[in-house]
Amino acid sequence: METVTLTIDGRQVTVEKGKTVLQAAVDNGISVPYYCYHPGISIDGSCRVCIVKIEKMPKLQTSCSTTCAEGMVVSTRTQDVIEARAGVFEFLLVNHPLDCPVCDKGGECPLQDFSYQFGPEQSRMEFPRREFDGNGVRADVDFGPTLMLNRNRCILCTRCVRFMRDIDHDAQINIIDRGNGSQIATFQEEGVHSLLSGNLMDVCPVGAITTRDYRFKSRPWDNPFAADTICTQCAKGCNVTAWIKAKPEWAKGSRLIRFTPRFNPDVNDYWMCDIGRFEYHWIEGEDRIVKPLVKTGDVQQPASWRDATAGVSERLGAAGTSNPDGIRFLLSAHASHEELFLFKRLTQELLGDSGPGAITVTWRHREKPQPAETTFKVPAVDAPNVNGARMLGLAPGAPGAEQREADVSALRQAVEAGRVTALYVFDPGPEGSIGDVRWIVDARKSGALGLLVVQGVLMTDLARAADFVLPGASYVEKEASYTNQTGRLQGTSRAIPLPGEAREDWQILVNLGAALGVPFTYQSADEVRADIVGQFSTVTELQGLTTLAFNKPLEARSWLQASNPSERWKWDFMYQDLPPVKGNVDPTALPLPPGAIPLKQV
């Protein structure tokens, strides 16, 4: 790798040849503000706040568009740089409304932070601000099915324009009009229609583009915990951060407040799709199963775990004794390695060597409407662990839709013909992720299927038809491992506690195995993973299971550090220490408005 050495503010730094001055500064912890630059999209150089002084160059240069050269001497804090930068900030704030108290970006807004650190102390402008669609939150207009737009806040950094052009490859956003009337817009105000639209909120450095899902929901300082995990909504396995809101147990509403992308150049870069970002409300929704249910007659009744486990083991054991070939397992590819492995062991102990043949792994397959040139592709497979099932010998052959359809079709024919006396369904994903299973419900109604056990998270029509319902964990409530579409081994983190009496799925299976006489001795999921590595020592991709790191929910060190989550690599070091308050004003010496009561000084 070729490198160049340059000096920035008296520090010698060595960087890869071809990097810009701004990238060199950021990589070495030197604070340089910027708005229009984003590491995941093309360089524009339009905001001008990253200007620096470079020796032997007659004028100040934009550091985001200036390539590093050997021996270059750069200054970021000379007096002329400070004054020019403050002037740029003053112009950026000329028409920017003081909406911080009602703006969703407040508290994690680069415009707030950089203006405080680098901008002027006061404005010299006294004329009315330019307004496009009204003022305050009344200026918010529809910007598509997932977004809201406030043009008054826009600083025309063009990040959104370049994202749609460079990443989505569908230039739905453009700058229209000229001069003071310039604004971002879509064709005939149709708004943005894209599977990647939520990323526009991440790239927007101000509160111009916000999402309907997070709008007015919470403030960054009310989200004190964040867990780095992965998304399991499809086979891509995007690295994401789950944000948890501070909420007492008795308060209504969700603890899980939003998902944002986490940078990983090998998986999802800086982005995530709208499915993973917005379709998470089922996790804490009203349809969550929070207690074991046992059907008595035609009515499902809450039961203890002891009674439910004993009932399942008794009925499964009886079915295995009378007709071992009549026991089948239908597992969603949302199941983790640990869960798939335990099911495989369970069937081997119950049914012998032919046991794994009783397992059918299924998932939903749906094509996503995206331009062919899109850089960020969303897979058609709506499950995170099809590859993992194949490695464990439960989904032979290539993980394609044809194989899945053939396996499910064979199981369906057996169920409808009455050859299946007991069916155990494991569905830890969102509703529909296991595919179309209405045929199971129909088989129950017709009497073709005798025993149905459902282990899952949602009270679906399938769960309502079951004799036993065992409440499990969603992907943000357990530490579990998955292999994505490229063969990369990753893990989810436990971000929030389990609801009600729900349990982690490996615990349910270990307890069920014990009730059936299966010699499970696992005390933790770590022990399950170690056993997988031991029994599949020839499968190279699974050998990392014992060293896989699972992240714990971390306290947000500061909401400034979490600002603009898609760029957290920058904020983590840029705001180690907050700058001192400007000015030397004694708040107790300020005159009080008529009728105001002074605060008691302690």
Residue positions per predicted region:
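N-terminal leader/propeptide and maturation segments of large enzyme subunits in energy/redox metabolism
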Residues: 98-137, 497-561
